[in-house]
């Protein structure tokens, strides 16, 4: 698990608005029409442009249904291996409500992650990242069943055991009260 303190560019006033902010930030970053070299910014756009160019060269001259199916399967596979839009959901674990999203599809990628974001204040959130890497087909088969249920079997239990409290210095409270 990786824990990050993150600041989002827009203000939010609850978990539902945080969900919308995270989804838009993700889309703006990975789907940026102008990819930035040596970063992941615009990576989905770049990957899909390459996939479309290849599919056009490979299958545009053929018009039968089998070729169209092959082309569509190729493009769908590339879409799922890139960075398709995410969908955030609200989930309450213990005393906290998180904005949760899944990145990656185990059927298409060897990296899969679930991210739980806990809103703090002033556009800040704590981001808990559970990242999984699958190596080889055998490990994928063995690990797949566990991975698909790990959000409830493992991640939720970890997050429920966290004790998160506001850090308040009693000296600062005494000064501000005077």
Give names to the regions the model predicted.
Residues 2, 6-11, 16-17, 24-25, ...:
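Short, well-structured beta-strand
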Residues 70-73:
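Low-complexity intrinsically disordered segments
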């Amino acid at each position: 698990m990786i824990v990050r303190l993150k600041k989002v560019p827009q203000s939010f006033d609850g978990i539902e608005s945080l969900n919308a902010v995270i989804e838009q930030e993700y889309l703006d970053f990975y789907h940026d029409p102008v990819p930035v070299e040596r970063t992941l910014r615009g990576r989905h756009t770049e990957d899909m442009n390459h996939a479309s160019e290849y599919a056009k060269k490979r299958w545009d001259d053929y018009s039968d249904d089998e070729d169209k199916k092959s082309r569509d399967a190729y493009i769908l596979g590339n879409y799922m291996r890139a960075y398709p839009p995410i969908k955030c959901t609200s989930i309450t674990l213990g005393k906290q409500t998180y904005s949760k999203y899944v990145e990656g599809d185990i059927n298409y990628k060897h990296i899969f992650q679930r991210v739980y974001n806990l809103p703090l204040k002033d556009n800040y959130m704590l981001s808990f990242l559970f990242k999984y890497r699958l190596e080889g087909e055998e490990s994928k088969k063995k690990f797949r069943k566990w991975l698909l249920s790990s959000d409830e079997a493992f991640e939720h239990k970890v997050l429920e055991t966290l004790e998160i409290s506001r850090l308040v210095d009693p000296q600062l409270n005494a000064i501000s009260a005077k």
